[in-house]
Amino acid sequence: MKKITSILLLAVMLIFSLSACGMGKPKIEDYEWKMRTIAHVEGEQLVYDAAAEESTAHPEAKIIEMTLVAKDGKITITDVTNGKTYEGSYSVSGRNPKGTDYNITIDGKSGYAGVAMTTYADGSEEPTLPISLDGYSMYFYAE
């Protein structure tokens, strides 16, 4: 009887641990995202666009407000500053112990994205979404 109880307990623990795999890893669909910074090259100069709260870190940056929502394979980026909306799709390209990687296409342009927890020097963490698309490096954080 002890042997059967031990085997059942081991099986329950195994099932629980396997079902927990993947939990805690942020995914693109889990959040509404807000843009923190965008970097791109104009001529030979690196140009930053930034959210208002980043203006002290990037005083030369053009201030813009941009949001991103992803659901069911569809992605929408809204530039609140100019009223433009950009739409596209995303698919999982890989998973790793810390998060999920994606192939994305927005307005016909292909790129890459990744979602993971970023840990800061003070030990705090937040979900982040860096995107590389058509010469632009965009950095979003969970709202």
Where are the regions a protein language model picked out?
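An anionic, turn-rich surface loop/hairpin at beta-sheet edges
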Residues: 51-58, 94-120
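N-terminal helix-cap/turn-to-beta initiation motif at the start of protein domains
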Residues: 21-43
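Short, hydrophobic/aromatic-rich segments at coil-to-beta transitions
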Residues: 26-34, 52-54, 71-76, 97-103, ...
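Sec-dependent N-terminal signal peptides of Gram-positive bacterial secreted proteins and lipoproteins
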Residues: 2-23
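Beta-turn initiation residues at beta-strand->coil junctions
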Residues: 37-40, 77-81, 131-134
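Glycine-centered tight beta-turn/hairpin loop motif at sheet-sheet or coil-to-beta transitions
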Residues: 81-83, 107-112, 133-137
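N-terminal glycine/threonine-rich, aromatic-flanked beta-hairpin/loop signature
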Residues: 45-97
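Edge beta-strand at a domain terminus
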Residues: 85-96, 130-143
